[in-house]
Amino acid sequence: MKTKNVTSSQKHSSLNRATSKKQIPISNVTADEIVAVGSTIELTLGAQVDPQSAQGAIRVVRGCEQVATDIALAKRGHVVTVRLDEAVIGACELIVSELLGTKGERLVDYYRLPFLVVPISGKIPNGLRVEHAVRLFIDDLGVVRLAPGEATRAGHVDVVKAVHRTKGTPVELAFDERGERVEIDKQLAQLAQRRADKYGRIHDTLFQRIEQAKESDRVPIVVWPRLELPPASYNKPADHRSVEPPEGEKKVTATIRKASAALRAVLQRSKIQLLKESRADEDVPCMRATATVAQIRRLAENKAVGAILFDDVSAINDLADSIAVARSDRAHVDGFDGTGIRVAVFESGPSVTTNLVFADRFTGSPSASDHARLTSAIVKNIESNKPHGHAPDCDLFSANSSDNDALRWAVNDQHCTVISQSFHRNSEPGGSGLQSDDVLKDFLALRWPFPTIVQAAGNFFVGDEDGIIPIEDEFVNHKGYNSLAIGNHDDTAGAMSGSSVFRNPTTTHGDRELPELAANGTSVSANGQNMSGTSFAAPATAGVTALLQDVDGVLCSWPEGCRAILMASAGRNIRGGTWWQDVVSGVDARDGAGAVDAQAGVLIAQQRRFRDAPATRRGWDVGTISSSVIGQDRLATFRYRVTVPNLIFFPKVKVALAWDSAVTSFLGFPLASTLTVDLDLLVRDSRGVQVASAASWDNSYEVVEFTARRGETYEIIIRRWSGTDSVWYGVAWTVTGFSLVDVVAFPFDQLTVAQIQRP
């Protein structure tokens, strides 16, 4: 890839020439921009730079390593050029510290410019800025993302998100290994058609099972009708909690019931018997049955059928420190304890309910389970002289069966707005894409009462029940777009557990990132139990979600808002680079957006904002994005604004955006949970300069975080890269840092040597 350096005269005709004031360098590279190998970065200043100071004050780092550069001056000393070594690839930062002018005056105190070096086979047209790029290998039935610069004998395709530097116009490009332009949309459409030709309406997991079976063998299945529903069929109320189905929901329900009736008639004509114990729930149109392989193949040819999936009914189970490290205790002190919030723990058991108080239970005779005793107690318990859970005053429901009927009971009958799940099915760890349960939960999140669903990412270890070899090849167990998968960190939020599953699912552009978050699941004790695993990180996050909903009831009806606040408030990055740096670099991160933080989340939840509102340090909003609020430049016509207080030292801004997939039959393809809209997240400073971006293809969320300037105000901008569907979204932001009060109150006497030495 070749890029044209933008000169200082082209970009800035009138610089402030005062040399007595500290300056912000003007760069020809935008924050988080992708540049070519061996590129030159220019920094323009309003005064002459001292050559010796430039050599000492300017450096480029990749992680903790300083990389080789050639530094020179141009334009009579007003421009510093930094040429990168050809060997530099990956996420980097250009850092300027105490840069002096020729008269000895300090021109720059401190300046950081994050950017990425990614090899791209083709030439990027002049005037375009690259914001994201992935290298893909497309085979007969799937996509493999290659590492930056990696090559294969079969070739590759580099796919690029770029924008015009001055107009901001989005441009998508793709190049083959020879640098020739190719039509990536056409290639992906051909891939989708090849998959449809092979699998038809049969999910690939089920397809693989029946390929090894006899035509007369009976197989448990889940059948969905053909549905054509956008992710947001109506404008969901955003100013109050929806205590009953909104008016628009009634029209959706009518559509669902019509499709369900048609499917039921098809099953009857096919002489396929529904399971007797399956719930008669017309609001959730999928139906469980057992059918022969021959019946399944014939059923897949019926146009009333949306998809046929394998009905996996297996269930494999995956407190004081937990509460403290998530800072839920600080939220309790502020008066938020989950009062009035309905939370369900979805898993088999417990039969022993000592120190547990349930508002109701799915069945009165569940199986015995110490695992379920602990997951329930993490949310809420009444053990004497012990912490009472993350949401001690919530209404806790026991969906005490691994059967999905228990999940539907919790959502549709008990109207729970938070669901915690800490088990997985046999087929999920080895499945590279969404499985049957993922589709169901994505559907439930889109229908009243709009639950926020939190799940354990999974655990791997030698000898585990999943039997995947090597063990690190296990996929994150729950892959839905409209829910959250949670990893496991230690008691200090300083390290991820070595057993916490992190492998990302396979997607069209290979940049999906799971899990979304991490919470403490290591050596968690409550109610006489002590265990470790992501199983215990999930209920901790569910409890924190209940605290957020306690702050503002609107969040009970907006899982998109809950997801955004949880990710924006996760200010502790446990491992690797920032979320976006890991995504662009192709690093399969383990901690997602970071460690769950109830205190930070509550502070955000207390600051509900609105479109184009004055700037605040923290805030959140929810709503519907439709074509009516998208301009010709694909940017939303409204803004959110964040301000950085002057008395905050080392400030950082973190912003998260979350939206939904659609559970629908799309253009004649089988029903699936599909992202029909691709949103990006941009942040600009008061000069209009872009300071951060996150622009993945395959996620239902974006996260940006960057070092900010005190006293500055930033604009948060949503861009719709592709798609036309209306979609519900949530956005949240916060500024973190240190104040004088923080320094005075810091417990230096409790700081250990290990904490000081931690990288």
Task: Enumerate the predicted regions with their spans.
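Hydrolase catalytic cores
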Residues: A518-Q581
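Catalytic-core segments of hydrolase enzymes
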Residues: D312, T417-A526, M567-A570, P651-V663
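Acidic, Ser/Thr/Gly/Pro-rich low-complexity segments and short DxT(G/T)-type signature motifs
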Residues: T7, H12-V37, Q48-D50, Q55-R59, ...
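Subtilisin-like serine protease catalytic core
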Residues: I210-S216, E301, R330-D405, D413-V418, ...
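Acidic-leg catalytic submotif of subtilisin-like serine proteases
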Residues: I138-V159, I221-E228, G306, A326-A368, ...
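Inhibitory N-terminal propeptides of secreted protease zymogens
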Residues: I120-A307
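Secreted peptidase-domain scaffold signal
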Residues: P237, V587-V677, V731-D749, V753-R758
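Noncatalytic accessory or regulatory domains flanking protease catalytic cores in secreted, cell-surface
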Residues: Q581-D591, V677-V735
